[in-house]
Every structure is written in C-alpha cells, then in structure tokens.
Amino acid sequence: MAKHQIIYTSCMRGIDSVNDGQQIFSYDETFKDRKADEVKSLFTYQVPSLPAGTLMSEEVAKTMPVAFSYRLLKKGSVSVTLNTYLGRDYMGSAGRFGNHLSHSIICDFSDFDIYPCELYASTALRNSMEYEEVNNPDPPAYLQIPELTKGYIINPESIIEFLEISNNLEMYKQMLTAMLRFQIEKKRIIICDEPENIVKWIAALHYTLPLDIAKKVNFTTYEYDPELSPSQICGVISEGSKYNCQNYISLNRHYVFDFINNQFTSVSTDNIMMDFLDTAFSFSYDSLTDFHLFILNSTTYRDCNDKYYSAYYLYN
C-alpha cells in the first residue's frame, strides 16, 4: 500500500463530488482504498455535549477535544488520524456549526518506522483549513504522498521529563501492568487528564515496547464512548461524553486512571521488571533500548502481553 493520506471536512466541492457539505476533500492520487469502510470509519468524530444553557460559539469550538488516534487496519496497514472540531462549515462566519476536519495517513505496517505518538503535533497532519481552500467551486488538487514527519512534542527525552513529575512514574507502571493484561482481560485503559498529558501517557506506554510490538497497540487521545471504541487505550474528558468516572470505577470493566477526579483503579506493580523500568526512565534509557534489541534478536516475544515479564527474566 505504501503511504497515503486523505482529508475529510466540509467544503463547497470535494475532489470526487459536485455537491457541497461534509465529504472527502482530497487524497493522494494512488490511494485505491479510499472508499473502504474502515477508511471511512477514521472520519468519525463526536463533539462533546455542552452544559445546559451553553450554546456553541467560535470560542467554545476552540475548547473541543482533539482526537489523535492510531489504529491497525486490514491488509497489513495502519493509520494515524487527527480529528479536529472546526466549528462552522466551509462558509465561514455565515456557516453552521458541526464541522470537523479529519486528516489521516495510512501506511503499510512495515513502512511505519516511527512510534505513532511521535506524529503528534507534526506538520504532516493538518488541524485547520484555509477559507479559500474549502470555499472554492473548483475541485481541489490531489494531495502529495505523505511523509512521516515527527512532531516537536513527543520524544524519549520529553517523556522522561514527564515521568519525573510528582508520582507519574508510579502511575505509568500501573498503566503498563494494565496494558500487558489486555490480551487476557480485554479491559481498556481509560485516561482522563489534561489533553497535553494524555498523549504523553500513551507515548510512555509505547516507548516501553520495541517499535513493531508497540505498533500493535492502538489508541486515541479522545473517545466520546470508550465502550464502543476500537482503541485499547482511550483518552476521555471528565464531562460531556459517555464516560462517567464513578460508573467506570464501580463496574470495573476497564482500568481507569482519572487524574481530573483523582480516582484510579488499583493495580499491583510488585514485579522486578518494574524496578528495571524505574531505572531506565530515571537514569538510563539506553538500557531500555538494549532490552528491546534483546527481545527482537533473542526471543520470540512479538505481542503486547504478560509474556513481556518472561522476556525480561531471560534478559536479566
């Protein structure tokens, strides 16, 4: 499949249409699977419910959560999508509210050579459109073949700094334990925190694993209804969605890490590997990359599950 990209939003005319409205704006010319249902599913975005008496406005629209998502697709491909609520449609100040922008990069699994979170805040994914682009009676041009250009926020150094804050390292180890149980328990990780923190929690979990294993763990930084999500790790907001902290904690169907309401599912981390990760993220990140090489060169461990502990025991 190589690399492809596709943009969906409100426009006067999309590349394949003569009508206006919410539609595919454009894609690269070689993207043959652009009409596949799983590609269309990437465009989905549910705006949060507003508090009673609050009307949508340009200012309120700017506060809506962004959904930065990574997903495994069929035919051995993966996608990274940025869904951004724009507010009004292509008509600008005269338009109606309800418009969002969805920009996806789709790539062969083997060609995706960076950690997905590293695309966060990348110039490769658009979060806005120019008025002249979408309010244009002529069909847009094809998009270029995309590049996997890293953003400026997520990298090992920034995650190490993040885990040094307060008791973040301890919370990370609980999240990791939960992530390694997913294959057996099928319980998602639900993270309620400030938007800039959610993606860092996810990146910390991904960096724990060798790249090709991390790429098997899908996520989203915002999910309106985690119960229906295709993601193993879901970021949520504390109000305005189907997520309810007390209900999720009491039902115990998922591992909840709610930093806004200070409510957490209790997870035991009594394991010698956690001491190793504590040291790796505190003093010696190179030791973690050495462990990754050992896994790939000396073990058969290739999926994110609790056999990760056994791989560490062999390494140790």
Per-region residue spans from a language model:
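N-terminal module detector in large eukaryotic regulators
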Residues: 1-316
